[in-house]
Swiss-Prot record:
Signal peptide: none annotated. One of its GO terms (cellular component) is plasma membrane. This is Glycerol-3-phosphate acyltransferase. InterPro entries: G3P_acylTferase_PlsY. It catalyses: an acyl phosphate + sn-glycerol 3-phosphate = a 1-acyl-sn-glycero-3-phosphate + phosphate. Keywords: Cell inner membrane, Cell membrane, Lipid biosynthesis, Lipid metabolism, Membrane, Phospholipid biosynthesis, Phospholipid metabolism, Transferase, Transmembrane, Transmembrane helix.
Length: 202
């Protein structure tokens, strides 16, 4: 029962869309209504408001970190086990992708996934973030960096911690993140994906 309750709480935390919340508080249009329609930091940046984009990025990462950290810190006293913690990690990510507060129209999950990985294991999170930075620096594609980082994350976890129940959760998160980037993948293959710093290609 503890596993299910903590997972439900994590899903509700994940369902808070900081792109929507920050935009509303700062008088910006709903992120679903412009650009890619994706409620994430990259789309919020298209308004030209860098502060709003940064706050969105921090908020989305923080909720992923917070849900897992709280469960790991306080959950065992209430009967939460390793399977439950893996459920929490997956649930907060699903909350971001399919938020109950926003008609299940969520973001792609890059920042939230980063927060989750940092909470699971700081070295794992930093290693995955380093992978993103390296790919982004050399190739200048944010989406490609996210895809490569998502592919490597489960392998990093196995190398550091072996195969466990959390491996399965990280693998599912990676698959879902890649699936959320299917339009970006098509644009990359067609040479139409915008590079970091470029204006959005039509």
């Amino acid at each position: 029962m503890a596993n299910l309750l903590f997972a439900l709480a994590a899903y509700l935390i994940g369902s808070v869309s900081f792109a929507v919340v920050v935009s509303k508080l700062m008088g910006l249009p709903d992120p679903h209504s412009y650009g890619s329609g994706n409620p994430g930091a990259t789309n919020v940046l298209r308004t030209g408001n860098k502060k709003a984009a940064i706050l969105t990025l921090i908020g989305d990462a923080l909720k992923g970190w917070l849900a897992v950290w709280l469960a790991a810190r306080f959950g065992p006293a209430y009967g939460l086990n390793e399977t439950g913690l893996a459920m929490v990690a997956l649930a907060v990510f699903l909350g971001h992708l399919f938020p109950v507060y926003h008609r299940f129209a969520g973001g792609k999950g890059v920042a939230t996934a980063a927060g989750i990985l940092l909470a699971i294991d700081p070295i794992l999170g930093l290693g995955t973030l380093a992978t993103w930075l390296i790919i982004a620096f050399f190739f200048r594609y944010s989406s490609l960096a996210a895809l490569v980082a998502a592919i490597f994350a489960p392998f990093f976890h196995v190398l550091m911690n072996g195969v466990d129940v959390m491996t399965g959760a990280i693998f599912v998160i990676s698959v879902l993140l890649i699936a959320r980037h299917r339009q970006n993948i098509a644009k990359l293959l067609a040479g139409k994906e915008s590079r970091i710093g470029e204006k959005k290609k039509v």
